[in-house]
A protein has these predicted regions:
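Flexible coil/turn and secondary-structure edge motifs
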Residues: 2-9, 13-16, 22-25, 31, ...
Length: 241
């Protein structure tokens, strides 16, 4: 069955129409190939053996890239202890951190989410566990579901040496345990800044729950979060204001 290359098709259109195209493609998928493009089942994985030292005050930030930021943001907005989850861009330079440019796939940016969290309520290691098991498929190289390109790569941008050590150890742990059917391709990249995405991308899953793309690819992830992390799940999402 021929698969739609959403990223290539939408790159030819202005931002507003790209979103419309994503909806039209989603509708087509619902009618002709919904099963092929539905969000993959989440994988139940062990928590990290190595985690950050327990912190009792303040907040911390973490940046994750795992395909289209709509779904990744939507998942983390439902995790207890998360104070904010912002869609944006990481990996490239400030002057190319715009959706239209990033969609061309040559900026070095990945669609990313910056998660602000209270480490006394949820650890960085737990966020990694959610990221790998629910938010995306870490075995897909430069793609997630119907979206293709380096801007959809699986990546972690540690903001400290401790975050980097925890992420490296967890990837090694999961690969050693053969937690997935294929090796993890997630890259640990240098953090050089995070650039928030345009306003119309923020809270997209919550504000557009009937968009076919969201219905097929992203809402199932929130359901899987609730199922696998019932003790961590928050019914009310923490929205960007």
């Amino acid at each position: 069955m021929k698969k739609f290359n959403v990223s290539t098709l939408r790159a030819a259109l202005p931002d507003g129409r790209r979103m419309g195209l994503r909806v039209l493609l989603g509708a087509a998928l619902l009618q002709t190939a919904a099963c092929s493009f539905a969000a993959e089942d989440a994988v139940s994985i062990a928590p990290p053996i190595k985690d950050e030292a327990v912190k009792t005050a303040g907040t911390e930030t973490a940046v994750f890239a795992g395909g289209c930021f709509w779904g990744v943001q939507g998942v983390f907005q439902h995790v207890q202890g998360v104070k904010k989850a912002v869609s944006g861009y990481a990996g490239g330079k400030a002057d190319t951190a715009q959706y239209e440019r990033v969609s061309e796939g040559d900026t070095g940016h990945a669609e990313s989410v910056e998660v602000t969290f209270d480490p006394s309520q949820v650890s960085y290691g737990t966020l990694l566990q959610v990221f790998f098991s629910v938010a995306h498929n870490p075995t897909e190289l430069n793609r997630q579901g119907p979206d293709h390109g380096t801007q959809y790569r699986s990546a972690i941008f540690p903001e400290s040496s401790e975050q980097k050590a925890v992420a490296q150890a967890y990837i090694a742990q999961l690969d050693s345990a053969k937690s997935f059917n294929a090796p993890i391709v997630t890259k640990i990249e240098t953090y050089n800044g995070f650039y928030p995405a345009e306003d119309y991308h923020q809270n997209f899953l919550t504000t557009h729950p009937t968009y076919p793309y969201i219905v097929i690819n992203d809402l199932p992830k929130v359901g899987q979060l609730k199922q696998l992390f019932a003790d961590r799940y928050s019914e009310q999402p923490v929205l960007v204001k």
